[in-house]
Amino acid sequence: MRKGEVLKLGIVPYMEGKEIQLKAFERVKKGETDGILILLQHPPVYTIGVSGGFDENILVPLAELKKKAELYKVERGGKITFHGPGQIVAYPIFNLAKWQKDVHLFVYKLEETIIKLLEEYGIKAGRKPKYTGVWVGDEKICAIGIAVRRWITWHGIAFNVNTDLSYFGLINACGITEFGVTSMQKLGINEDIEKVKEKMVDKFSEVFGIHFSEITLDRLAVIDNAKA
C-alpha cells in the first residue's frame, strides 16, 4: 500500500494555506512520501479558477462582495467558488506517478471518496453529467478544483458540512446558474466537523489505497527546511 501523510489544521487564512500546499508539494516532489493530505477550513474567501467567468458569475457589485469575504484568483481549474468556516477543504498533494497518470481518474476518485463518506451518514449522493463534484439531487455538496504540475496534484475539494450557504447567493458557484448548493446540515445531519474529517481520511485511504501517518505543521516545516 502507498504511504502518505495527513495534516489536520483548523481555520487557516487562504494564502497561508497555499504556502502550506507548496511546502507539501516540494516534499512529495522530492519523493519523501507518495502524498500529503491537508485538511483545513478557511475564513470567508471567494476564489476564481483559471476558467475565469469573473464578471458574469458575481451577482453583486465587486465592492460589496469584498466586504463579505476576501477574493483571489488561483491556479486551480474551474470558476468562482466560496470557502468558509464549516466547510472542509481537502488538499490532496499526491504524486500521480504512484497511481496512474490520469487526471480524470483522479477527479473520479475524489468524487468517489465523498460519495462513500456521505453513505456513512445515510445520504445518497452521486455525480451529475457534464459537471464535476458531488451532488445530492440537484444541489452540489462538494466542489472540486485541482491543478497538476509534474504529475503532482494540488488544490482540491471543498465539502460543505455546516457552511453558511448564504455566501453562495452572491455568486454563480462554479459558473452554474441552474442548480444550487447544499450541506450536511441542510440535509439534516449535524455532525462535529472534526469527526467528519476523521471519516474523510478513512475514505481517502480506502479509495486511493494509501496509508496515512499524521504529521503536524511544525514537522512539515522542519522537513521542508532540512531538505532545502
UniProtKB/Swiss-Prot annotation:
It comes from Thermoanaerobacter sp. (strain X514). Belongs to the LipB family. Its EC number is 2.3.1.181. It catalyses: octanoyl-[ACP] + L-lysyl-[protein] = N(6)-octanoyl-L-lysyl-[protein] + holo-[ACP] + H(+). It is found in: Cytoplasm. In the reaction, the free carboxyl group of octanoic acid is attached via an amide linkage to the epsilon-amino group of a specific lysine residue of lipoyl domains of lipoate-dependent enzymes. The active site is at C174. One of its GO terms (biological process) is protein modification process. Catalyzes the transfer of endogenously produced octanoic acid from octanoyl-acyl-carrier-protein onto the lipoyl domains of lipoate-dependent enzymes. Lipoyl-ACP can also act as a substrate although octanoyl-ACP is likely to be the physiological substrate. InterPro entries: aa-tRNA-synth_II/BPL/LPL, BPL_LPL_catalytic, Octanoyltransferase, Octanoyltransferase_CS. This is Octanoyltransferase. The keyword Transferase applies.
